[in-house]
Amino acid sequence: MGMAIATDPRVAKVAFTGSTSVGIKIAQGIAGQGKALTLELGGKAANIVFEDAALDQAVEGVINGIFFNQGEVCCAGSRLLVQESIAEEFIARLKERMTTLRVGDPMDKNTDVGAINSR
């Protein structure tokens, strides 16, 4: 269905967010048709923390990066790279901060982590 819409001559622009393999198929399917194309494809967004970072702020950045919207965003910080010299301290702070996250109703503004769809 998606390819039928993307290749339809009445469609002037295709915007797709999803997997790299499907993005490649879409790009191949509309090649040569003169359509505008925007692809936001799967990847692994990394949080990188160096030893000169303000660690508490970096912890908050990591928490927001992975838990915002239950992690269901295309740019969720799904990888964490920490300079070796601060890794132990940073991970300890991150673990401590994670224990304070409030799990509950995603519609409650005070909830940090709500329900996650697994199907």
Label each region the model flagged:
Residues 13, 19-119:
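ALDH superfamily catalytic-core signature
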